[in-house]
Amino acid sequence: MIIYLHGFDSTSPGNHEKVLQLQFIDDDVRFINYSTLHPKHDMQHLLKEVSKVIDQSDDPNPLICGVGLGGYWSERIGFLCGIKQVMFNPNLHPENTMAGRIDRPEEYEDIATKCVDQFRAKNQGRCLVILSKEDEIHDNTKTASELEKHYDIIWDESQSHKFKKISQHLQAMKEFKNT
C-alpha cells in the first residue's frame, strides 16, 4: 500500500496523475485529503486517517509519500506511524513558507516543539528524498544539506516543484519500499 499526501494545492489535477503513476508499483494507493490551512488539525486528522488505512491493509511494507507540504507531513506522520516515507521537494519549514498563505503558520513551530527530539536521527534510512534541480519554490541545495546526513537523496534534472511526472523514480521507490 502507498499512501499519497497532496501538497498545498490540494485541487491540482497533478494529484490524480501521481496516484495513477504510483499504481504502477502498487495497485493499492490511498489518497488522503487534508485542509492544508489548519496545521494542528491537519496533524490530528492525518495521524488518525493514516493509522486507519495501515490497520486496514495487510501490506507488510506500507509507504507514505507526498510532494511539497505533503512531503513535510509524510516524513512526520510516517515516522509517528512507523512506516517508510518518500518526500518529493519537501517543504521543510512551512512555518516560514506558509506565512501569508494560511492564518496561523506559527502552528508549525508548535508542532516542531512537540515532535520527538532528533527524530530524523531516529528515522535514519526510513525516508527517501527526491529533489528537483528545477524547483522554482524552494532552494533544494538547502533542503539537501538539511537532510543528507539522515536520508538518501535522488536528484531530478527536470521536474518543477509540483513534480508532475514521478514515473522515472518509481523503480527506486519500489526498491526502497520493499527493502
Curated annotation (Swiss-Prot):
Pfam families, alphabetized: UPF0227 (PF05728)
Database matches in InterPro entries: AB_hydrolase_fold (IPR029058), UPF0227 (IPR022987), UPF0227/Esterase_YqiA (IPR008886)
Signal peptide: none
PANTHER family: ESTERASE YQIA-RELATED, UPF0227 PROTEIN YCFP
Family per record: Belongs to the UPF0227 family.
Name the UniProt record assigns to this protein: UPF0227 protein VP0969
Species the sequence originates in: Vibrio parahaemolyticus serotype O3:K6 (strain RIMD 2210633)
